[in-house]
Structure formats: C-alpha cells, structure tokens
Amino acid sequence: MKDILKLFKKNKKVEEFDSIKISLASPEVIRSWSFGEVKKPETINYRTLNPERDGLFCARIFGPIKDYECLCGKYKRLKHRGVICEKCGVEVTQSKVRRDRMGHIELAAPIAHIWFLKSLPSRIGLLLDMPLRDIERVLYFESYVITDPGITNLEKYQVLSEDQYIQALEENEDEFEAKMGAEAIQNLLKNMDLKKTCKILKKEVLKVNSETKRKKVTKRIKLIESLLTSKNKPEWMILTVLPILPPDLRPLVPLDGGRFATSDLNDLYRRVINRNNRLKRLLELFAPEIIVRNEKRMLQEAIDALLDNGRRGRSITGSNKRPLKSLADMIKGKQGRFRQNLLGKRVDYSGRSVITVGPYLHLNQCGIPKKMALELFKPFIYGKLEQRNLATTIKSAKKMVEKEEPIVWDILDEVIHKHPILLNRAPTLHRLGIQAFEPILIEGKAIQLHPLVCAAYNADFDGDQMAIHIPLTKTAQKEACSLMMSTKNILSPANGEPIIVPSQDVVLGIYYMTRKKINGKGENMLLSSPKEAEYMYSLGAVDLHSIVKIRILEYKKDEKKNLTEKKKIIKTTIGRAILWIHVPMGLPFKIFNKTLRKSHISEILNTCYRLLGLKKTVRLADQMMYIGFSYAAKSGVSVGINDIIIPKEKEKIIFQAEKEVLEIDKQFQTGLVTSSERYNKVIDIWAIANENIADAMMKNLSYEIIFQKNKKKITQKSFNNIFIMADSGARGSAAQIRQLAGMRGLMAKPDGSIIETPITANFREGLNVLQYFISTHGARKGLADTALKTANSGYLTRRLVDVAQDLVITQTNCKTKKGILMNSLIEGGDIKETLKERVLGRITVENIYHLNSKNIIIPKNTLLNEKWCNILEKNFIDSIIVRSVVHCETSFGVCAYCYGRDLARGKIVKKGEAVGVIAAQSIGEPGTQLTMRTFHIGGAASKVASESSIQIRKNGIIHLNQAKSVINSNGKIVIISRNVELKMLDKTGKTQESYKIPYGSILTKGEGQKVKAGEIIAKWDPHTIPVITEVNGYIKFIDMVDGKSITKQNDELTGLSSIVVLDISERNILGKDLKPALKIIGKNEEDIFIPGTDMPAQYFLPGKSIILLEDGMKISSGDILARVPQESVGTKDITGGLPRVADLFEARKPKELAILAEINGIVSFGKETKGKRRLILTPIDGNNIYEEMIPKWRQLNVFEGERVEKGDIISDGPESPHDILRLRGVQAVTNYIVNEVQEVYRLQGVKINDKHIEVIIRQMLRKATIINPGDSNFLQGEQIEYSKITSENKKLKKNKKETATFSRDLLGITKASLATESFISAASFQETTRVLTEAAVAGKKDKLRGLKENVIVGRLIPAGTGYKYHKKRLKNRIKNSVNKKNNMSSISVEEAAANLSELLNSTENINNRI
C-alpha cells in the first residue's frame, strides 16, 4: 500500500509558495507534527550505542539510524521499505527522516511560553492588562489571581498574596475562584471575549485624554485585532504540549575514550522530561500542594531555559560553567541560524592566494597559477577528457590529472579559454569588490592582478590575498561576462566617475612625459607628425620635455557619429606628442596638451567614455598604463636626502613665534589674559608659524631659476623628485613634505586636545627624545582609532544595507508632479558644488524656460546628461526642480524616472536594479576613510567663529532674502529680521556668493545696488545682540526701578554711566514681577505703533541688557536701544566623521537642540517657574495660543513682541531633523540630511552622489502616524506605511468618504529596518526574539518581496537577473490559477495521493493503538 503511495509521491512537485506565514501553534497542531511522545530522558545506551526506546533519540519515534534497516536488524535493505518492524516498532526507511521527524512531550501542567511573557512589551500582560510583575508572581506560584469573582466585592484579574487569599476565603468562603500558576493565566486567556473587549476599548480610546493611556489602549486594540484576524487563540501562548526537535538537529556524537559530545538542547530537554515525569508521579500520588507547586515551578523554569535560557533569572549552566545554548540562542546573533547559515553560506569551487602585480595584462585578464587552475577546473577537464575519448571513466581521467600528463595542460588551456572567473578581495565593501576576469595561465603560486583594478578592490601588493570563484553553469558564465567583467565596471556606482584611474607610478610616468622644460635639446623644432617626434626622440635628437611645434591630426565626431579630420600645427612637447600616438580618434588634443596630473587623467578617461564609449576607454586606459610604467622607469625618479630642502627662513619664523609666546606668557602673569585665552593664542601662533614655514618650503621646492639662451633669468617648475611625486598626485602631499622639510608642528594628546609645545624639528633634521615621545601620542591614537573605525564603519554599512535592501527599480515612471529644488551650493564666496554637478543624471519635473523669454530650453521628463547640463550653464539658470526618490509615488520600490541615471553605466537606470543596496554600499564603503574624531574648537578655529563683517570677493549686485530693515540716523540700512541671507548676483542674475547676516547688522549698500570686489558691505558686533527700534519717538522707561529691576553702573575709565537690567535670579522679591521695557512714545505721550501692525512699540529687555540711553531721550528708527551681551562660549565639541554620519542616519536628537517656533505668531513671555521661562506664541489669526517652557540658561534669539514664522529659530543650537520635518516638511528635512552628510564626506574629499543619501532618506520616511482616521480602518496614533495610507486615501476619495489625516515620521535606520513589513528580514537584522514574537501573535505573512527574504528561502533575488525570473514566476502562477479553475472537475494525481494517504493514516493509527 505504502509503495503505491511512494509512486504517487514521485510525481509530486514541490509546491510553489509565494509567502510564509508565522503564527502560534495550537496543542493539536503540535501533536500533528509529532511522530510519538518522548517519555524517558534517556538518550542512548552507552554500551550498544543504540537509542533507548521512548527516549530522546528513540528510533521508533524519529526513524531508523541506518538507511533502510530497523533497530533489531530483522528488516534490512530497500525491498522492505515502508515496513514497520513488529519487534522494535521502527519504520524501515531512509535515516535522513531523523532530520525532520519531530516528537512531543505531554506536559503534566500548563506552562507559559517565556517569549510571550517576557519579551517586551509582554503580550500576555498587554492582553490581560495586568502588570508583568503580577503575572510573574502568579506564574511562579507566589500569588493568586481571581479568575471568577462570583458575587463578592473582589475584582477579576485582582492579584492576592497568600495572606490576602486566606483572608478572602474566611470572608467569602467558596463564593469566588482564585488560582495560581500557568493554569490560572490560561483560564483567564481562554475566558476572554476578544470581540467584546475590542468594542469596549474602541469606545474608550475616544474618551481618553492622557497621551500615555491612549498609546496603551491603542496597543491593546492592535494586539486584540491581530489575534482576531490571524485566528490565533490567546490561550495558545500557554503550552500544554511541548514539541521536540528532530534528533539529527541536536546530535550526540561519541568521542574517543567513551565520552560524548552533545548539543546543549539534549541537556535542556532531559531536564524538562525529568521534571515533567516527576510532576506526573506526584500528581498521581496526590502529593501535598506545596510539593506539587514547587515541582510545577521547576518545570516552568526548565521550559523557560529550553526556549530562552537567561531571559528570566540566572542562566542554567552546564558542567563547564558555561550557559547552555537554548533554542532562542540558536537563531539570534551573528552565529545564529539567520546570519551564519541562511545569509552567509560557504562557496564551493574556490581558491585563494597572495596577489602580485601583472603590468602586462589587459584590463579583462588576470593571471592564475597553473596548479591552481588545474585544481579548480577539474570537473571541466574530466568532462573534456571523456568527451575526446582520452579517458574512459572519471576514475581514469582523475589519474591522468593527478599524474599531470602533457595532454592535460592542453585541455586546461582549452577549458579556461573564454571561461570567466571571479576574483574577490575581503572586505567586500561595495559591488566592485568582486569582479570577473579571463584567466591567463602563469607559472608561480601568486595570482596576478591588473594594476588599474586595485583602486576598486582597495588592494595593494604587500601581502594581500584574494579568492577565486568559478562560475560553473552557462548562465552564470554569461552573467559574469556581461555584468561583472572588469571592463564593464569602469565607472564608480557611488559618483559616476571613472574608478579605473591610474595611480602611483603610472601617474608619475605620464606626468613626467607631459612636463615641459625650457632650454631642452631641439627646442622650437618643426615636426611633421607625432610619429616623427617619437623617431627623433629615439635617435636622441630631442629631449622628452622640449617645446616643439608639431602638425597634429585631430578627429571630431559629428551628430551622425562620423569622424571628420582636422590638421593643426600646435606648440607642444615631445612627450605629449608620443602620448597622442596611442590616443583613440575622436578626442580633442587640448585635453592632452598640458602637464597631466592624476585628476586630469581621470577627466580624460571620463571624456573618452562619454564621447567614444566603453571599448575605446578600456583600450586607452590600458595604453596609458603601459606608457606610464615605461616612462616612470625611464624617468629614474627616486628620493635622495638632498631632495629634502629646508627653507632658510625657518629659523627666523620660529624665533619670531617664540618671542610672541613669551609676550603672551607675560600678559598672562600680569593677569591681562585668562588661562584659556593664553592657551588658544599660543596654539594660534604656532599654527600660523607652521603655515608660514610650509609656504616658504613649497616655494623653495616647486620652482627653480634657470637662464634662457639670451642669458635672461626665469623661473620654471622644478624637477625635484619629491615635488614631482606630490605635484603629480602619485604619492605624498604638501602636508607630508612639510613634516620632512618644514616642521612637524602641533601634536594632539589622545583625548584630542592639542599639546601647546610644538615639534619644531622635521624628519630631515631628526627628532630629539622629547619630540619623539610627544609624537608617539598621536601615532598610537591613530592605530587605536583605525581598529575602532573599521568595526563602526562595518556596522553602519550593515544597518544601511538592511534598511534599503528591498528598494528595487520596479516601474519606469510613477508620473509624480513633485520634485526637489536643486541649486548651487555656495558658502560665503566659495562655490562648493555647481548646479551642473548636482543635477547631472537627474530628470526634470517641469519645462525649463529661458530666463527672459518663454522659450522652452529643456522639456520636462528629460534626463539631464552632460549636453543638457552645459545648456543650463550657458543660459545662466540658477536653480531647477528635479525628480527625486524621496517623492517617488511607486508603492513598492522606486521608478526609474525618479532615480535618474545609473551612475555606473551612464544611462537611465534599468528595471530590477537594486538601487537600495548600491546606495548603502556607496555611503558605507568610504566609511573607513572618515575620522572618528570629535573636534574641539579652540585656537585657530575659534577665530573663524567670531566674524564681524563681510567683504565681497567679486563685483556684483546685492540681493537680500526675507529681509526687514530700517534706515538709521546716519542713512545706513539696519537689518531687523533674523535668518537673512545676502546674495551677490552677477549681471545675469546668477548667485556667485552667499552670506548669512545676523540681526542688527549695518549695511553700507542696499538691495539691488552694485558693489565692487573687496568692498566691506556689512558690519556687526559679534559679542552683543542689539535691540533696535523701528520707529521715531521718545523713550519712556517702564518697570525700571533702580535696585529692583535695574542697576546703574559708572565706568571709571570713560566716565559714562549705563543701566544694566538685573536677571530675575538676581532681583529681590519686589522686583520679581517687574518687566523692564522701553516704550517709544510720541511728543504728547501717545502710543506709536510698529509699522504694519496694531502693536504699540514696546521693547521688553532680557536680563543683563545694557542701556546707554536716558529716559525721555529722542531717538530715530534704526537706533540701538540696548545691547544684550552674548555669553562667550568656551571650546565646543563638534562631532565629526563617522559618528556624525551615524547620528544623522539614526535621526538622533542632538543635545541642546535648537528650539523652533511651532506656529506663526507673536512672541510673549508668561509667568516664569523655577529655572524655566514660559514662551507664549499668539497666532495673528486668533487660533489657539502655543506655550512652551524653555530653560533659563538658553539664549533666546527673539524679543517680546517680535513676530515669528513657523519653523523660525527661537534659540540657537543644532537642529533636530524631527523638528525640521514637522515644521518645514519633507523637502527641508531631505535637504538638511543630504547637506549634513555631504559636509562630512566633503571634508575627506570623498564624492558621493546625493541620490544615494536620498534613497536612505526615503526609507527613513516610509512610516506615518495617523492623526485622524476618518472613515478608514486605521487607529488614531497608529504607525503605518506611508504608501498604505496614500493608497487607502485614494480609495476613500473615490468613494467620497472622509480620508485619514497623518503626519510623516522620520525613523532612524535601525528602527526603520525593524519596522519593515517583512518579519524575516527584520528578524535576521536585530532583536530576533522580539520580532518573531510580535509576528507570531499577529499571524504575520511575509510576501517575500525584499532581497533578504528571498536569499533566506534560497531563491534568486527579485533584482538584477533575478527580476525577470520573479516576473516569469508571477505570470506562470496567474496562468496556473486560471487553468486550475477550469480543471476543477478532473481529479489530480495529488488529490488521489492525498485521499489514499488519509486512508493509510487511519489504518496506521489503528496499528499504533494495538
């Protein structure tokens, strides 16, 4: 009978599944998994090594130990398969069933599952609305809980201690029911009417006022609703049957010497079985209650330890004092099931070896040692040998290979021809860390690597190792060739610039050959072609650097891509002409006719790629490498001690600095400067001295004086070896040369503070003992930092990948009308990034018109390539709106138009591209280059902080943004609004410079006026904030009582008197309620109103204000009424580098953050409390007023009566991204995070495209909180996917119902990863227990849409080449479901098998009973 079933089963295919559901298992389900009950704690017999019957390894329950053989040996071999032995009860089948057959234990008492009890928030506690502490006391038999209060005055869910219970019994006898232990909790859960409770709670949530209570009730509603929808019963959180893992997943292995190695789970299971059996016996014997209770508690503890050891109480330890590894520990953490086995698998067919340089290789080749290739390509060689009939069997082929017969090498040559291999270098930080090459067989044992791919791998040849992987199938080879080949990856996915850029000796060689030299041999010759130049050079008739005139043939591509030639006679050098020979047609000569540094070579490759395409660029890169190596060798550059030239001025500069330091020490001793001022000044002096020495040294090194033929003295760039290396970008920098030939300068202590005695010596002179000791500080800190940095950077990358892993391009155009405004980044007089650089590769949202006419220059939905960007620049366009992933309206994934250009390919991105992972890698990969430093601003940096004027760099026209101003009595303009931006525009109206101007600045020129370069146009006092009047009139003092609210001071030196307002803390009781103010009144004491409002001109003065006017004085608008001193801030810490990036992506609130105005309105101050000020904002339209308490030590930027806009800064400080989102919207928070992250990377000279950061921001913004649910099913205060809300609102709008209102949330990347829809992805990231608990209770379904989930279930990922596969599967599934509906009448093989198996099971059950 079973054989027939097997026959049916052979035809049965694995059922296609498209989602995985997780839910609570009921006792019935657990029993249905089981193949029998385990009754004994025994494992195996120590003599026979056979499993004990009914024990943890029982063969009757779990299956035979040997294939097709029962335990007693009665039935052996395949012919008896399916038979159950009468003697030992073992089914004759394969032994691998021991990997998937489960058993179970019938528990003598119900036990609470620790995950649902202790994993916060406790599910059982939330459901019963009882504190966790009380539930634990009930479960561990310390207290009773009322399960049925009857007609007594006790309440259900009330917890009673032993004494209270006895007292209640005396009072009420048996009118009520109270229990303890898990049965009590099970009873409560069973008797819960979920639907009724849910209805009551939904009514209650509307009445609740307190925010915390509302949150709690909402949580309960969500939990109850999820239980109802998932059909999970709450009592299933209490176990009555415990499943047992299949024995082969918790093996017991005999070691030599009669000992056993076992999985910890066996110990834990034995403990449970022992205690369970003991409890059964005690219950049968009707043992005293106290003993039974103790046994039940011990059983509860044993099961807790099995499920999650250490979650409650002390961990159970094994014989070696090590905590036992429970089921929960098996799946969580780096060594857990998810990260160790499902996401990180080992790869077969791989080898690894040291790498060495292969300067003669082509870009698509790598050298593989013959021995290695022979081993790796074995299967292919065997196949070929058999195919050619050179070997009859695999065995003989194996022998031939082992003997290394000559024919084998020929076959190997054939096999590896056009068979790509993958080379990988750990750590693989971005996708270019693994690339494909064509193998070339070489002698030796090291892999040879092409020098140009080193940058992508971050490899060098100081002992680095690389791994080789062989793609086996035809499709894998095809994929490696078309996508992963090194020649296909010449642009970096992070910024779209070439990553195949020559470095070091190649750069040196090319720089050397393109340098020019005056008085060279054969100068001013006329040559007919570059070929002739090369010939003359080889004859020795001319020098490589001689300036000559040569006829150059240039080819230019026209619109139809045809080449047209052009002849020119050009003044150039011999070296440049020789280089031109190897350049492909179609490039202009002007980009080669200069001294080529590293950046120029990168530009050349970029231009070549855009103009001539991939193949020619690869060829050019290779040619440049060969030439570079050749001429680097010919140049004979090497470093000699005499190349390090110490400037003569050094001694003088150091002497001067020491003199100044002594002067400051004197001032300190006489008390003129404070200790911190002295320290800052000393450090400043040395920093400036160091700069001066460096300048003198570089001047000295970089130029040499030579005589022309006419005896005229001229300077030319020097050929000093060290200078050549630094100038070309091959090795070293000005900062390093400074240490060799200048002075080492200031050193930092490990805590980041600067040691004030600098090292005045350099390495050429040598350091003395003290100097050497000081410099070890920095060196050690550097090493320690590097180790920390690597770990931190890796963790950041992991979090980024996790949050963005499911973002894939799923659609071409989402047709959104939204976009982000892009303009040039200008800080002061410097352009940080031009508009062209920022919008390259983006898509326009709307038509772009000519500035003066209505002609469309660029139509909407255009991909801005280099050509369009040049048009933008020509037409002087300052800012445009482009599409961005932040605003993409695709519900799952992103659309190609919102993403724009695929940076690594230079074309619009294709469907299926995993843009999320690329973004995460691009941001994470340079992480190791960032610093871990926290900068202390002091000394040199603090000078910048106190600027007091603005000097213009270029001629232009002034433009003021959002500025309110008045004219003062001297006719100057005074700014009376905050956050004013002053821009300098050129003739075309394009911004050239941009400055921030504080309140109270005095401008010499006004809006629209012309200014000349070098003019100072704004001045202000950096140490005080002025209070400025907007009207003319007379002063009237209000609430200014000497000794109570103010005090008068006389300055002895100047003889001037001033009035100082006392701070509230300094006033006596009588002065506390006084509000000192200056009111401006007319001649007849009438009120004067502030222009544009109906508010009288009255200026309240904050504490410590200094007033230099007298009561009744006449004043005019723009005059300063009072000054508020700004407290001088000490050294500030600025978080920089990697920690700053992590803070931004985690959306952490900064300490002492800026306080922003929550609404538009007028500022006033209410009654103060101890240590806090009450700020009141009164809206102009008469809506509700807004109040906020602000600590008194915070310096406020606003005065009473001032009008502020929503989002304006009230108190300075770092802004919180959450506030920016709430008050200024998505666009503002995107700009803020992008600019702040870019700031950190820009400092290190790392280029990352904005769109990568935007991709991460999109993921951080994917949740929103419901404010008013309207007619939707959402709950108030619930956090839901933004895309879900928008689609729901569309439906509601269609049906003319009330839509839900919501506010966008900004989640940190860790939170966003855990809040993803997919529980598999979240569980494999962090907090596995919590995620799985939550998912199980809610009966969550994972639709397997992201990349991680598909890797875990072992499928191709739905991105890249797997994207088509998933689309195809979807089509087939829809097709099959249609076919199934049509063929419902005819019975399928599967159904027949199912019916038969049901029949068999019933007979099998009868046999078991007998």
Swiss-Prot record:
The RNAP catalytic core consists of 2 alpha, 1 beta, 1 beta' and 1 omega subunit. When a sigma factor is associated with the core the holoenzyme is formed, which can initiate transcription. One of its GO terms (cellular component) is DNA-directed RNA polymerase complex. The keyword Transferase applies. GO terms for molecular function: DNA binding; DNA-directed RNA polymerase activity; magnesium ion binding; zinc ion binding. DNA-dependent RNA polymerase catalyzes the transcription of DNA into RNA using the four ribonucleoside triphosphates as substrates. CDD domains: RNAP_beta'_C (cd02655), RNAP_beta'_N (cd01609). Belongs to the RNA polymerase beta' chain family. Keywords: DNA-directed RNA polymerase, Magnesium, Metal-binding, Nucleotidyltransferase, Transcription, Transferase, Zinc. HAMAP family: RNApol_bact_RpoC. The lineage of its organism: Bacteria, Pseudomonadati, Pseudomonadota, Gammaproteobacteria, Enterobacterales. Its cofactor is Mg(2+); Zn(2+). This is DNA-directed RNA polymerase subunit beta'. It comes from Buchnera aphidicola subsp. Cinara cedri (strain Cc). Pfam families: RNA_pol_Rpb1_1, RNA_pol_Rpb1_2, RNA_pol_Rpb1_3, RNA_pol_Rpb1_4, RNA_pol_Rpb1_5. Zn(2+) 1 binds at C70, C72, C85, C88. Binds 1 Mg(2+) ion per subunit. The gene is rpoC. Mg(2+) binds at D460, D462, D464. It comes from the Bacteria. Its EC number is 2.7.7.6. It catalyses: RNA(n) + a ribonucleoside 5'-triphosphate = RNA(n+1) + diphosphate. Zn(2+) 2 binds at C814, C888, C895, C898. PANTHER family: DNA-DIRECTED RNA POLYMERASE, DNA-DIRECTED RNA POLYMERASE SUBUNIT BETA. One of its GO terms (biological process) is DNA-templated transcription. InterPro entries: DNA-dir_RpoC_beta_prime, DNA-dir_RpoC_beta_prime_bact, RNA_pol_asu, RNA_pol_N, RNA_pol_Rpb1_1, RNA_pol_Rpb1_3, RNA_pol_Rpb1_3_sf, RNA_pol_Rpb1_4.
